[in-house]
């Protein structure tokens, strides 16, 4: 099962990739301000919640993507994060996917018991251009995490990751374009370059989505949100390439699910034929 855990909500725009933040846009549709940061009390202890039968609501083997509407190392969340670390420690049977742009804050905000890291945590640094990649990934190389990844999203200019991938310290790279109210283009050639680098070093690569504006072979495509993932999958820029569209029978709603590449069932249908 793949799910999202947002122990807090809201964020402060931090770098170029934040200009057209999807969370700010979605909040604005509800007449809310995305810069308002607050603890999500009803969901704060999600990993520890149990059903009436005493079993965890998040079953063993699940992947929890943490703070998808914020940043895990946000300054305003320092006190809440201490509790989150303890919950992560108490659930070694599920994987916690952490993301941040705030590379310089990570080391000083690890718990005292951290040591060389936990087996059930993957630390993913988000980068949007070469400048931010060089700033952040050099830091991540030296941080005490057993599992590390890179997410180029929204990718707003060409990036090369060869010098970082060659270290053997990264397990996965993801690329996505800009969506919702953002229209900065994503070029096929940019995606292909990173894909080739991942293939070179046998690193998992996931082209998550094209974004609203996708350019290939000199042609500009304006792609609706519902089809951005589908078009990315059809490019076959996935490593490993574990499927071809025509070979898989899937639930209709799965065609637009951004987590389809790593899906092992979801809380909505639990009938995924992906496997």
Where are these regions (language model features)?
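Generic structural signal for well-ordered alpha-helices
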Residues: 84-88, 137, 191-195
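Structural beta-sheet core signal
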Residues: 98, 123-125, 150, 207
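Conserved beta-strand edge residues that scaffold enzyme active sites
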Residues: 102-103, 154-155, 212
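Anion (oxyanion) recognition and catalysis
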Residues: 89-92, 144, 192, 199-200
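Histidine/lysine/aspartate-rich catalytic loop segments that bind and position anionic ligands
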Residues: 125-133, 138-172, 177
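Conserved, mostly hydrophobic/aromatic
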Residues: 18, 66, 98, 140, ...
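Auxiliary Fe-S-binding modules of radical SAM enzymes
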Residues: 3-9, 162-275
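Conserved Radical SAM active-site core
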Residues: 2-121, 130-134, 159-170, 266-274
């Amino acid at each position: 099962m793949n799910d999202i855990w947002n122990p807090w909500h809201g964020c402060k725009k931090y770098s170029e990739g934040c200009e057209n933040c999807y969370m700010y846009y979605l909040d604005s549709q509800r007449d809310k301000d995305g810069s308002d940061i607050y603890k999500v009390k009803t969901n704060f202890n999600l990993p520890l919640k149990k059903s009436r039968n005493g079993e965890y609501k998040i079953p063993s083997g699940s992947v929890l993507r943490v703070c998808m509407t914020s940043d895990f190392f946000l300054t305003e969340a320092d006190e809440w994060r201490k509790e989150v670390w303890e919950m992560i420690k108490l659930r070694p049977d599920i994987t916690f996917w952490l993301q941040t742009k705030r590379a310089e804050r990570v080391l000083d905000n690890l718990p005292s018991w951290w040591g060389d890291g936990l087996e059930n945590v993957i630390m993913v640094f988000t980068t949007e251009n070469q400048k931010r990649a060089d700033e952040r990934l050099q830091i991540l190389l030296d941080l005490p995490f057993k599992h590390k990844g890179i997410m180029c999203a929204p990718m707003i200019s060409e990036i090369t990751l060869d010098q970082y991938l060659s270290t053997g310290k990264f397990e996965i790279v993801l690329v996505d374009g800009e969506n919702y109210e953002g229209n900065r283009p994503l070029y096929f050639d940019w995606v292909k370059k990173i894909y080739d680098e991942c293939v070179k070093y046998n690193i998992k690569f996931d082209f998550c989505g094209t974004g609203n504006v996708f350019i290939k072979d000199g042609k500009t495509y304006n792609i609706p949100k519902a089809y951005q993932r589908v078009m990315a999958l059809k490019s076959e820029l996935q490593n490993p390439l574990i499927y071809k569209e025509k070979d898989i029978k899937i639930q209709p709603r799965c065609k637009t699910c951004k987590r389809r590449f790593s899906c092992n069932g979801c809380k909505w249908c639990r009938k995924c034929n992906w496997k």
